[in-house]
């Protein structure tokens, strides 16, 4: 369309059609076309989506209806060797491979009113202790272990998978066909904390054996925070107290 030999000369630039303004126009045309295209496809799929929304099931129970009540069991630092997995909780008696339990968050069970426990989630938060270490956390877990099975403290990595986004992993402990009978756990939790898990949780939920490692080639120090999250449906939900000049 134009003389190619004049392409790089200064004074012949005015006759060239493709300048910056022209590029801008092309770009905005493209954007316009894309926007209209998106609107058309949205209008096309909207009734289908409305229909699908009626049958939608939340995949992750953590996101579902209900309230999440967390009890942090412990927070500690462990050294993990390469190509091995370390057991986090062996649930034998009161000790989780440790002498004392640290109960963070609250001294008593935070659930007071009549509440139905829909689900129990085992949550794991992992953090590297040294800065600038580039490795990913791996884990393996078993749910249906025999109650008398004595788990090994350290195992070789079998087929691990990478710990989920944000270095947080949640394991759903619900057993199929088991409903949880108690509606008020606070008294039970307070009077015998030592037997709380054995007597009141493990008959109705899976008891997880969780192993954690990483794909680094050196010994790494890992900060492990373990908590149990109760998924709760409230019969008497919390109502905000009215405060103001009229009350």
UniProtKB/Swiss-Prot annotation:
GO terms for cellular component: viral occlusion body. It comes from Agrotis segetum granulosis virus. InterPro entries: Polyhedrin. It comes from the Viruses. Component of the virus occlusion bodies, which are large proteinaceous structures, that protect the virus from the outside environment for extended periods until they are ingested by insect larvae. Signal peptide: none annotated. Keywords: Viral occlusion body. It holds the Pfam family Polyhedrin. One of its GO terms (molecular function) is structural molecule activity. Belongs to the polyhedrin family. This is Granulin.
